[in-house]
Amino acid sequence: MFGYPDPSRRFTMGLGSIVYDVLDDYIVHASFQRYLASERSAALEHLHNLEDLNIYQNSVVIFDRGYYSEDMFRYCVERQHLCLMRLKQNYNIAKKCSGDIITILPYNEKDGTEDIRIRVIEVILNDGTNEYLATNLFDSHISQQMFRELYFYRWPVETKYKELKSCLAIEEFSGAKTTSVLQEFYINVLLSNLSSLIKNQVDEEIQITAKSTNKYRYQANRAFIIGRVKTIVPKILCNLFDLSALDILYKESLRCRSQIMPGRTFRRKKNKAIGR
């Protein structure tokens, strides 16, 4: 089902994709598709799921570079998804942008489309490089700096992918059949969300009980919670533990906390590998 990156190297690969609530730390929808499947197709599946759940209104979907296309943007406009998309610098609408502009995507009589408005924003990063964002948010009170900050809200999804790969080892499948692979993929998504639920509750309790005289702020240790959840949940499902084990984990997590280090930044490492 999933396909091979190289016929001479017989290991299977697939495309995992998620739509992630960056404020509440939950994976809203996840999909696992064959190797070299379209990321835009995966994104459309996520949008369809948000529509089915009726949870897309008053939410802004933030897309990384590579997801933008005129068809994708038109879909968001027609289905009333608020969106913010990073543009590649070689797109014409990006080349024509200086500052903050509203322009028109012209109709196509052959496709039966109409003119639609699109707002393009130029943002300058700390290192002086320019990025370009496209949106259907036309409120003039939302400034370029606000859009810059809004786009950076998507960064937690990168750490969520890292969590799935490193802490939950979502790429290390023990099964060989399609059904078992999908089961392992989605159980790891479930474990991630369960860990987030526990962490959110613990963080709330830590904030309530924190003293104003404390020099540092603390939060629950995510790695500790994930490690314990991976051990506890299978035993609960096998009736070796009862649900009270999660209450015990909650109390343990209140004691095992980590210091919040605000303002930390890390230089992003560029992948120097040459693609096939």
Q: Residues of each region from the PLM?
A:
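Single, function-defining residue in the core of a domain
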Residues: 4, 8-276
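Two-metal-ion RNase H-like nuclease active-site motif
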Residues: 1
